[in-house]
Amino acid sequence: GEKVGNNFLDPGWTKYDKCALYVTFDLSGQLKQGGNAIGVMLGNGFFNIPRERYFKLLASYGAPRLLMKIQIEYADGSTQDIVTGTDWKTTESPVTYSSIYGGEDYDATKEQTGWMQPGFDDRTWNKALDTGWKTRLLSQRSAPLTVRDRIPTVRLFKTRKGQWVYDLGQNFSGIIRLSLHSKDTHPVKLYPAELLNPDSTVNQSASGAPFWFGYTPKGKGIESWQPQFTYYGFRYVQVEGAVPAGQPNPDGLPEITEITGLHTCYSAEDVGSFHCSKPLFNQTYELIDWAIRSNMASVLTDCPHREKLGWLEEAHLMQYSVQYRYNLARLYEKTFNDMRSTQAANGMIPTIAPELVEFEGGFKDTPEWGSTFVISPWYIYQWYGDTRPIETYYPDMQRYIDYLSSKADNHIIAYGLGDWFDIGPESPGESQLTSNGVTATAIYYYDVTLMEKMANLLGKPDDARKYQELAARIKQAFNRTFWN
């Protein structure tokens, strides 16, 4: 069997009760005369989050499921469609556990040779079930996640407690590639982490624990494996149940010949770079670039481990600077649809999109976060000259502005998270040094000024006049309330 494409964690995650993405591949290079076969492995992703191990949230739309259509066009112009149904076969795979938050386990002893090839004997497999599950299907137009970099181990050390730790020398989002030699089926666990404890063991306390990659070898010599349905943010990998090759091994454990980090991220086109004569600035740029890439998944996340959620304030706060480095037009196109899918009946935009979990208070509704739905389409127009997001989502933006207006008291909005995590006398969290009314009302004003510009762009003079007048009233109220 031959894998089609190099996509990782496909398709991108969405609010599945509203819509799901489908991905298209060209199979012409794989089809052969005579018998052909296609095999698919399914993981849980955000569709079904298990309770075992670490989880930020619990959400499930049921067991993983597959919808596929293969369209074949013959030389004579005729076509044939092959569609998934109850005549397809299914069985348990060697992936015995997969969680977007908790890790992945793979039991190589459960592999079935040739399962994805013509002529495989599937008589012991079960017929697929028709789940009857329906949602809106959309083509995934944004680029896939792929492996961008391969990161070798730069240091290997043993803790005082006797555990072996591999240092990859770089924090990144991704998975590992494990190569080992084994004479039996002794399971191996690999714990990734960004930090170390004082005793040099890995520390997952700030990144979501426990998380591990588990591998049970076949026990027949050299084997290699990498996870398929999860990822984490890490630099270090602590090993349990194996030893590095060449080290004392009195218990006959599997011997690791190599651990390589695979940096996975959204495969955006590089459009810019930075370099100067001052090393500090170059190092700062590299640090920021790694952080940006490690948080570019099928949504723009705030961290690649503990939450992996699309917190929206980053989408507009970082948009201009990141667009100097990467072409993100298609990723923002998906983000806009995610926001539309999560918009409430009253027009409110939650702080995360897709809204895979409903938070409360400011963590659900904060103007500085929801305003991405107004700000980012304008930035896309400024950057790429593309008016389609504005044309498509203008009515939804109007609903959001109406919602903010309903929350205003004499044109002042004073709720939400505010200047989140500012440095003040108390432990960081909600704004301490700047009242919420300052930032929330300021961004409300900014939203309305952009709505005036977009109304003019779309040839809606009445709307433009309405937003111009509203902006003037907000400005007057802001200065009256906050200007000393």
Predicted feature locations:
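Extracellular/oxidizing-compartment recognition motifs
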Residues: G1-H305, E313-E314, R330-E333, P350-V357, ...
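Amphipathic alpha-helical segments within well-ordered protein domains
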Residues: Q319, W378-Y381, T449-E452, N456
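Conserved, charged catalytic cores of large soluble enzymes
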Residues: A442-L457, Y467
